[in-house]
Design a protein with these regions (language model features):
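Structural preference for solvent-exposed beta-strand-turn elements
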Residues: 1-366
């Protein structure tokens, strides 16, 4: 029999992080449940859909050790709606009794023995990295942008983690755009594709942490902090050799304020909706002007201009949504936008000395 006391705030937060992983697979109804189990002086709260398992640990006053599984959404919504304060949890047979002030309930559960075994990674044998949480969250945002939603090309639905020239890189592509982030210096060798959905879970689960440990074995990845652990299967397959898509030089290089580039792009996009989002970017070296033109056959047309440093004249047509999305996630005051003619990939980087983020957008045929 388990009998513990926890705070409503910590329990609600942990349950809300776990509940979305609970699956609705009819063949395994127990995956709708989450696992509660005492673990030393803490309460373990875990959920899995057999592809990913997430575990949260919260401090608890433990009278009796034990475990149970209970419906994820019901218990999460119930605890979330309770007032702040202590919550008493007690198991009796296959039922969880919950008491908090004037509120009490009994939730039917299933014995923990029927719950799938939570996956683990052998830390001694794993490839390990220690990463600043904020740096990781930023890298996830910047690369997940280019992840494909096409499940028939599974390797493109994740983010590729790999080492190159002494650094750990993250990369993603959907065939129309490519994002690459240099994360940390490291000589540890890894080549693994992590599902984008796993990285989304990691991002929302580590808000209060400063460092996170990432461990890889041949088929799994584990993200671990003191109070959280997420273990996920890797995507099987070989990621494309994307580096050949990144141009080594550029005929036309444009240095422009990000705010100016964003404004003219968003205005042009208003008139590009009828034409599949296509906008034409023209660079004039003589006038130091970047102009963006778009046409809507029913509404009219638009040309917007911004001052920029331009190395050579050039013109290219892009999807306005792709350009707007990448400009929204770059922090720099100035952007370097470069290309080699109408049909070559366009490169977007921050205008800083050693930029660690590269974004590629393939042009549209104008």
């Amino acid at each position: 029999m388990m009998k513990v006391s926890v705070t409503q705030e910590k329990l609600a937060k942990a349950l809300n992080l776990i509940k979305d992983i609970a699956s609705s697979r009819n063949e395994l109804p127990i995956l709708n449940n989450i696992l509660l189990r005492t673990d030393g002086g803490r309460l373990l709260i875990a959920g899995t859909n057999l592809e990913i398992a997430s575990t949260q640990y919260i401090g608890a006053k433990i009278e009796d050790h034990g475990s149970i599984t209970i419906p994820a959404r019901l218990v999460s919504e119930f605890i979330t709606n309770l007032p702040s304060g202590p919550v008493e949890l007690e198991t009796k047979n296959e039922h969880l009794h919950i008491t908090s002030g004037k509120f009490s309930s009994v939730i039917n559960g299933v014995v923990a023995d029927e719950y799938p075994e939570l996956p683990t990674i052998d830390e001694k044998a794993a490839v390990q990295y220690e990463i600043d949480v904020e740096d990781l969250k930023k890298a996830i945002v910047q690369t997940k942008l280019a992840v494909s939603s096409d499940v028939t090309r599974a390797v493109l639905t994740g983010v590729y983690w790999h080492n190159y020239e002494g650094s750990l890189y993250l990369a993603a592509t959907d065939g129309y755009r490519l994002a690459e982030k240099r994360l940390i210096k490291s000589d540890n060798e890894v080549s693994a594709i992590i599902p984008a959905s796993t990285l989304a879970e990691v991002s929302k689960s580590v808000s209060d942490e400063k460092k996170i440990t990432v461990l890889f074995d041949d088929s799994q990845v584990c993200f671990k902090t003191g109070d959280m652990e997420i273990v996920s299967r890797l995507i099987d397959g070989k990621f494309p050799d994307y580096r050949q898509l990144i141009p080594a030089t550029a005929e036309t290089e444009i240095v422009i304020k990000k705010s100016d580039f964003s404004r003219v792009t968003k205005i042009a996009a208003l008139f590009a909706r009828e034409s599949g989002g296509g906008i034409t970017i023209t660079a004039s070296e003589e006038n130091s002007l970047l102009s963006i033109h778009s046409i809507a056959s029913e509404l009219g047309e638009n040309t917007s201009e911004a001052t920029a440093k331009i190395s050579a004249d050039g013109q290219v047509t892009l999807n306005s949504r792709y350009l707007t999305e990448v400009l929204n996630i770059i922090d720099a005051d100035e952007i370097v936008f470069s290309f080699n003619g109408k049909l070559s990939p366009c490169v977007i980087r921050e205008q800083i000395k050693n930029p660690d983020y590269t974004h590629i957008i393939m042009p549209l045929k104008s």
